[in-house]
Amino acid sequence: MGLENATKLMNYISKSGKEYICLLQMHCNVDQKELKEIISQFVGEIYQKPPVRSSVKRRIRKRRIYAIDILDMQDKLILLRVQSDAGTYMRKLCHDVGVIAGCGSHMRELRRIRSGIFTEKTNMVTLQEVSESLYLYRNCKDESELRRILLPMEYGVCGIPKVIVSDTAVNAITYGAKLNLPGILAYQNFRKNQDVAVLTLKGELVAIGESIVESKQLESGKKGEVIRPKRIFMERDIYPKSWK
């Protein structure tokens, strides 16, 4: 959930890797050794066609599953932990496991425990917690819970390569100007055409842009355009203009 300018970050966060706890219902008895062999076939690059009931076009999509762990087994119920790319359909994965097993299967329950850097154990909260913290603030003037669950939007770019820019470069970027090499003070490695977060010396998020060159080319010291802004987060004219 994003508020105000932070809503612009949601698209980037939604594309990050996911981790799920999934309850799989087999339609026949399968021993653990056989199930492990079946599941191992789905680790790596897979091809999926979205289920009939989905919000996207039903075309073949390539996704990557990084790991599938069996947490528990009771009769025909299998508890799984799955780490995957964004956009991987767990419902379809459960169905396909049953197809390979030769008896069918379906997903009974699903819980997302990680989205990018946001995890259930650290900084993910339920809508109920949001509602309760807002109630405390409005009715008891207690903002402690709101402060606990509200994170600065800079937190949302932890998984994106970053560049630190000089104060004189900030305002031009907020007007949509491309970032040139002289304005960069520090950077993390990035590839060409990769999303890069642009931050001030104070760590404030200015923009997210697409790299025009790879970071290795910056070592040459040659002047030129480095980042093309895609999403601007900072308001204009907070930092002084470097032009007249």
Task: For every predicted segment, state its role.
Residues 2-7, 192-196:
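N-terminal, positively charged regions that mediate nucleic acid binding
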